[in-house]
Amino acid sequence: MIDCIYNSDSIFEIKKLDSNSIHAIISDIPYGIDYDDWDILHSNTNSALGGTSSAQHKTSLFKRRGKPLNGWSEADKKRPQEYQEWVESWSNEWFRVLKSGSSVFVFAGRQFAHRVVVAFENSGFTFKDMLSWEKDKAPHRAQRISCVFERRGDIANTNKWVGWRVANLRPLFEPILWFQKPYKTGSTLADNLIKHEVGAWNENSLTHWNIQQGALNHSNILKVRITSEDKGYHVAQKPLNLMKLLIDLVTKEEQIVLDPFAGSGTTLLAAKELNRHFIGYEKNNGIYNIAVNRLGIEKNNCFYNKEKK
């Protein structure tokens, strides 16, 4: 049923969707970077990624984060491959349900974005582009290594390493991976547009939703701010207008947008407000209820018979 969000795991439930029935998939998938419990896709965990500090202990985000058992050591070398295998466990189904020429936008962590690309290419997709969503601010902690030596009483190394830090730079951009399901050999893009009405992009969406785009800019760098109305729904919340930009970029009214990792329903709400149909999945009960309330839909109208595997 369209215009619904289902309280279930899309990895299994998406198999119930018809082949070649979806016009676009837009999803903020788990990044596999230990952001929260739902983002830890390996068994090798401990506490805060990149070491801990008193500042981190005061911040709820860093209290939640998992850490590879040995930090960023050789013990973590299997994690990228494990993440790629997890993506490949569902990307084939994404390919199946999409119409030829349809677009997929996937928000991916910088650390493992390349593994998402490989997984999707292995599933048949064409990697079209990598967009950049630029943010005004982002949570960030990079521990001063001199402080570590100072706590050890190692004055020589404290002085030697003043100004040096561990962990990453402040993450002020997020990659948005753009994939496309290729049209059939022997056809043309124009023929595919006539048949499936997907495969091109709408330049007006860039100037309408993006605060930095000029009429002829057509840049793959997107600047969409998070507003007060975007906050408080999910720890990894994306701006509603950013999702509207992506939906408006590759779909037309009355077409179907799918979000298999729907979270608090931002993609689905954007689709609804743009007069697109939507289908979403969210297995976390609490977050699912938030999405239902935002969408203003009745749960009973979106009942999915889970016995039909």
Swiss-Prot record:
Catalytic activity: a 2'-deoxyadenosine in DNA + S-adenosyl-L-methionine = an N(6)-methyl-2'-deoxyadenosine in DNA + S-adenosyl-L-homocysteine + H(+)
One Pfam family of this chain: N6_N4_Mtase
InterPro entries for this protein: DNA_methylase_N4/N6, RM_Methyltransferase, SAM-dependent_MTases_sf
GO process terms (BP): DNA restriction-modification system; methylation
Family matches, as SUPFAM superfamilies: S-adenosyl-L-methionine-dependent methyltransferases
GO MF terms, alphabetically ordered: DNA binding; N-methyltransferase activity; site-specific DNA-methyltransferase (adenine-specific) activity
Entry annotated with the keyword Nucleus: no
Coiled coil start-end: none
Record's keyword terms, sorted: DNA-binding, Methyltransferase, Restriction system, S-adenosyl-L-methionine, Transferase
Family indicated by similarity: Belongs to the N(4)/N(6)-methyltransferase family.
Designated name of the protein: Type II methyltransferase M.HindIII
Organism, scientific name: Haemophilus influenzae (strain ATCC 51907 / DSM 11121 / KW20 / Rd)
Gene this protein is translated from: hindIIIM
